[in-house]
Amino acid sequence: QAKQPLLWLGGGALESGEAVKTLADAGVTVISSTHGRGILADSHRASLRAFHNSPSVEALISQCDFTLVAGSRLRSNETRSWTLELPTPRVQIDIDPAAASRNYLMDNTLVADCRALLAALAARVQGRIWG
């Protein structure tokens, strides 16, 4: 139901490149942690890259209406010491149940392998365009 989802990638999603590209091609805004850099090419039109502590990137993030965090810890150096406002609702995918809402409160946490879950999500977006 999101009109403009944000996908935040971390090192736990390193094997998810194909699914992430499918989602980005459909208009999902993608940003990555330092550890998730390269999952989606920085040159992709939907990529906000890994260096996101700037007013212009934060303005783009503020236009999103849903955050899916895939395999990222949302570290302090990537979120202005956890003051960066991430769109809600927020859903986290992590294989480690202890990661649930570790640094940001999540509305839901899916304990799963990012590669499998993002691939399943990408398979469901056929024909869908966001943004």
Q: What do the predicted segments below correspond to?
A:
Residues 8-93:
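Glycine-rich, anion-gripping cofactor-binding loops and their flanking helix/strand elements
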Residues 1-2, 86-131:
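Phosphate/pyrophosphate-binding active-site segments
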